């Protein structure tokens, strides 16, 4: 019923999946309404009211955690990636009170959320330590996360929430994955970008991961953004180590991609983020590719009564 020059295009690309949800058929991994300058043709022509909820919210993400709401920006958005990499200092995370909605979380939920939050806060602080390289800070964050994981595996939730984790060992650079391992771990059976498999093949052919092209601050901000977004996943899988490993692997892959492609750092961040965020199985494949065993699946986490 839309009477507009875009109506014919809209009808042509609109699809309905088996569950009755509508979506746009993509072309070379791109939304058919995404202009070359990265703007939405629908929004630019018809206004924000024409967007679906997914497009209206993007690149914002929001997660309800116990008695708070966390928000952030997806680095799949070119503007979000550009702004992140233009920062001259590590990220700062801002909190503000929300209106009381009457929800009262249970004791176990509060305890576990407090524990995982404390671990993530410490990891974020370690990633931003002044006077250290980004690699050294990643190593320290990984050492701490592994120590915290031992506490979590032993159900020492109160100790974690109170920050009582064994002293972090002396800095030691993490053992780097080879380019071939990284390429296999980030491979996708249904890539959004048709060039993704070829770039990963080029990465796999590298003899070693090259030095990062990004600055230390850029590496820090990117690692912080990944840990901020995924650090609380441990509420489901009980794994506080994987978000740090994911951040480290992403930084190494970006260094490799910078050596084999003509993309800018911001473009590469967008590329990698889109390939991961738009595939619900991507993180599971990445975990398997990096030979990381999941601590607990979501159902086991809910059934765990030792909290």
Predicted regions and their residues:
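Immediate flanking context of iron-sulfur cluster ligation sites
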Residues: 11-52, 64, 69
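Hydrophobic, aromatic-lined core segments that form the binding pocket/scaffold
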Residues: 128-300
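Glycine/small-residue-rich phosphate/adenosyl-binding loop
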Residues: 6-9
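Generic alpha-helical scaffold signal
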Residues: 4, 25, 34, 49, ...
């Amino acid at each position: 019923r839309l009477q507009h020059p875009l109506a014919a295009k809209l009808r042509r690309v609109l699809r309905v999946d088996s569950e009755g949800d509508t979506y746009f058929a993509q072309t070379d991994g791109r939304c058919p309404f995404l202009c070359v300058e990265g703007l939405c043709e629908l929004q630019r022509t018809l206004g924000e009211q024409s967007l679906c909820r997914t497009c209206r919210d993007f690149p914002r993400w929001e997660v309800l955690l116990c008695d708070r709401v966390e928000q952030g920006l997806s680095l799949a958005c070119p503007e979000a990636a550009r702004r992140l990499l233009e920062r001259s200092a590590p990220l700062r995370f801002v909190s503000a009170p929300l209106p009381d909605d009457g929800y009262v979380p249970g004791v176990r939920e509060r305890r576990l959320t407090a524990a995982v939050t404390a671990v993530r806060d410490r990891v974020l602080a370690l990633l931003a330590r002044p006077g250290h390289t980004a690699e050294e800070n990643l190593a320290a964050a990984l050492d701490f996360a592994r120590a915290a994981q031992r506490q979590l595996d032993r159900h020492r939730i109160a100790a974690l929430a109170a920050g009582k984790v064994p002293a972090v060992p002396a800095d030691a650079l993490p053992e780097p994955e080879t380019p071939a391992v990284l390429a296999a771990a980030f491979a996708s059976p249904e890539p959004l970008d048709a060039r993704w498999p070829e770039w990963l093949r080029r990465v796999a052919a590298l003899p070693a991961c090259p030095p990062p092209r990004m600055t230390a601050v850029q590496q820090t901000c990117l690692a912080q953004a990944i840990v901020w977004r995924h650090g609380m996943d441990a509420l489901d899988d009980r794994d506080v180590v994987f978000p740090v490993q994911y951040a480290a692997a992403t930084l190494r892959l970006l260094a490799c991609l910078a050596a084999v492609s003509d993309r800018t750092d911001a473009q590469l961040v967008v590329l990698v983020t889109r390939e991961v965020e738009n595939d619900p199985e991507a993180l599971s494949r990445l975990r398997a590719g990096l030979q990381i065993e999941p601590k607990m699946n979501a159902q086991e986490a809910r059934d765990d009564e030792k909290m």
